[in-house]
Swiss-Prot record:
This is ATP-dependent dethiobiotin synthetase BioD. Its cofactor is Mg(2+). Gene3D superfamilies: P-loop containing nucleotide triphosphate hydrolases (3.40.50.300). NCBIfam families: bioD (TIGR00347). GO terms for cellular component: cytosol. It is an enzyme of class 6 (ligase). Pathway: Cofactor biosynthesis; biotin biosynthesis; biotin from 7,8-diaminononanoate: step 1/2. Belongs to the dethiobiotin synthetase family. Mg(2+) binds at residues 18, 56, 117. The active site is at 39. GO terms for molecular function: ATP binding; dethiobiotin synthase activity; magnesium ion binding. HAMAP family: BioD. It catalyses: (7R,8S)-7,8-diammoniononanoate + CO2 + ATP = (4R,5S)-dethiobiotin + ADP + phosphate + 3 H(+).
């Protein structure tokens, strides 16, 4: 895989972007690459003696090698577990592109690949003037879409893909992640998604119970190099 960085987004919130990002980090490391994660903006943080910390950002840090400083991985750690724009207003924090770009540049200098995880679904804004598309353009990286397999996934996947492309960005692949283990016709839905989405398919993850080490699933994903 020749990419030096990419942005992981999803069809919605709670569809496994962090877990998929961690799997991708382990996959890259297994290929001998130095791979680090980044969560530019995270809402829903717990205060500790080292400051505000976000569970997803900590998972990315644990899956990274080398292990970057937390503040590089997650420049904006917002306390409230709500939409980032609201969380930033409540925390009286102004999310700006410059600190995000600076952290990304430092991470890129430390690793062969940087896996940047977004917030919520693709259209979730970071603030009143910065969308995720704005950030991705500033970082000059392509996008990977995580599709949560549950009822309605066809609509969400097609809309998300169309939105990314309408924003003038490259969507270089998609990953199916089973959210609802009781979803009817999973294989049929997966087959239709593979027919309808005009981007490369990187693999399918079954429903994963809590506590599974993402490293054990690294061989299930097969990025089609860029």
């Amino acid at each position: 895989m020749s990419l030096s960085a990419f942005y992981v987004t999803g069809t919605d919130t709670g569809i496994g972007k962090t877990f998929v990002s961690c799997i991708l980090l382990h996959m890259l490391r297994g290929r001998g690459q130095r791979a680090v994660g980044m969560k530019p903006v995270a809402s829903g943080c717990t205060y500790s003696d080292t400051g505000w910390r976000n569970e997803d950002a900590l998972a990315l840090q644990a899956a990274s090698d080398p292990t970057p400083a937390y503040d590089l991985i997650n420049p904006y750690a917002l306390p409230a577990a709500v939409a980032p724009e609201i969380a930033a207003i409540e925390a009286r924090v102004t999310v700006a592109l410059e600190p995000l770009s600076a952290s990304f540049t430092q991470l890129r200098a430390q690793a062969d690949v940087v896996v940047v995880e977004g917030v919520g679904g693709w259209a979730t804004p970071l603030n009143a003037t910065i969308d995720q598309a704005t950030l991705v353009r500033a970082l000059e990286i392509p996008v990977v879409l995580v599709v949560g397999l549950r009822l309605g996934c066809m609509n969400h996947a097609r809309l998300s893909t169309a939105a990314i492309m309408a924003d003038g960005l490259r969507c270089i692949g998609w990953i199916a992640n089973t959210i609802d283990p009781h979803m009817a016709r999973i294989e049929e839905n997966l087959a239709l998604l593979r027919q309808r989405l005009p981007i490369p398919y990187w693999g399918h993850l079954p429903h994963i119970p809590p506590g599974i080490n993402p490293a054990t699933l690294a061989t299930r994903l097969h990025p089609q190099g860029d």
